[in-house]
Each structure stands twice: as structure tokens, then as C-alpha cells.
Regions:
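Acidic, polar-rich low-complexity tracts and alpha-helical solenoid repeat scaffolds
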Residues: 1-167
């Protein structure tokens, strides 16, 4: 439609979803709907006066969705469900590669691989982290683990979960 208020209506629709986003521990349905609505606005009206705000908010919703995946992945990691955790962290890297969650996702992937005894995979993830995020706190933490002689197991990352449970 050529009505000048149409793009504003698309923007308001996206804002309605966006304003209902709570936190990463809750259902991400509104976050997904907000992202789709902002992307729809940007696709239909790329030079709209709302485009800049829509772009910013779509980046924030992507970061929020990545945070949700990270929260679920951390939960699986704490439960020692390493394969499920790896799936979540890989989704962050694959689907939300421009978010600030990626360095931690790489760290947690290495953590999961080391917990499974898959040191070659952990080494590859560490190399990716060092190449792409050399100044990240998460890469520094990962490098500290690699300096630890006991790096074959989960100690040094989450620590020994069994020892924690007993204390």
C-alpha cells in the first residue's frame, strides 16, 4: 500500500512485540515476533524514517535470542548434558554471529568438548576464538585453561562438578 502511514503501522506492530520482551529466562516468542516484524519493515521500507531504529532494535532482539540460547546451553552444561549444550552454543555461532554472545559461546563449546574428552575439537574452537576474538575476556579465560596442565578434563572451566556438588 502507498499510504504514508503504512510504514508507521509496520513499525508500531514491531514495537508492540518488542515492548513485550522480558528477559532471556522467559519464552522467546515475542522476541522472535519482534525480530520478524522489524525485518519485515526493513525489507518493505528500507529508506523509512523508522529504518534506523528498526535496525538497532532488530540487532538487540538478535542479541536477546542469542542470550536465550546461551542460558539454555549453560543449563545443559551444568546438568552435564554436553551434547545438548554444544548444540545450543553452535546455534549462537551459526545464527547470531554478529552478537556479543559469540566469544562466550566459543568458550562454552571448548568447555563442553573438554568435558567430553574431545581435545582436538576444543583445540579447533580455541583457535577460532583466538583468531576472531583475541581481546575477549572469554578468549583470555580459555587461554588460561590451556595453560592449566589438567586441561584434559572439565577442571579449570566449570570446575569439577562432582566436587562442587559434594561441598
Amino acid at each position: 500500500p502507498a499510504d504514508p502511514l503504512t510504514e508507521y503501522a509496520y513499525y508500531l506492530k514491531a514495537l508492540i512485540f518488542y515492548e513485550q520482551i522480558v528477559d532471556v529466562e522467559r519464552d522467546a516468542d515475542m522476541t522472535r515476533k519482534a525480530l520478524l516484524a522489524f525485518e519485515d519493515l526493513l525489507r518493505r521500507y528500507p529508506s523509512s524514517p523508522y529504518s534506523r531504529d528498526a535496525q538497532l532494535k532488530s540487532e538487540l532482539t538478535r542479541s536477546h535470542l542469542a542470550g536465550k540460547e546461551m542460558a539454555v546451553g549453560r543449563f545443559y552444561l551444568e546438568q552435564e548434558h554436553y551434547a545438548a549444550a554444544l548444540t545450543r552454543f553452535a546455534q549462537v555461532i551459526r545464527n547470531y554471529d554478529r552478537t556479543n554472545q559469540v566469544p562466550e559461546a566459543l568458550y562454552r563449546m571448548a568447555e563442553s568438548y573438554l568435558s567430553l574428552g574431545l581435545t582436538e575439537e576444543a583445540d579447533r574452537v580455541s583457535a577460532v576464538a583466538n583468531f576472531n576474538f583475541p581481546d575477549s575476556v572469554w578468549t583470555a579465560r580459555l587461554n588460561e585453561v590451556y595453560e592449566n596442565p589438567d586441561r584434559e578434563g572439565p577442571k579449570g572451566l566449570l570446575g569439577n562438578l562432582a566436587d562442587r556438588a559434594l561441598s
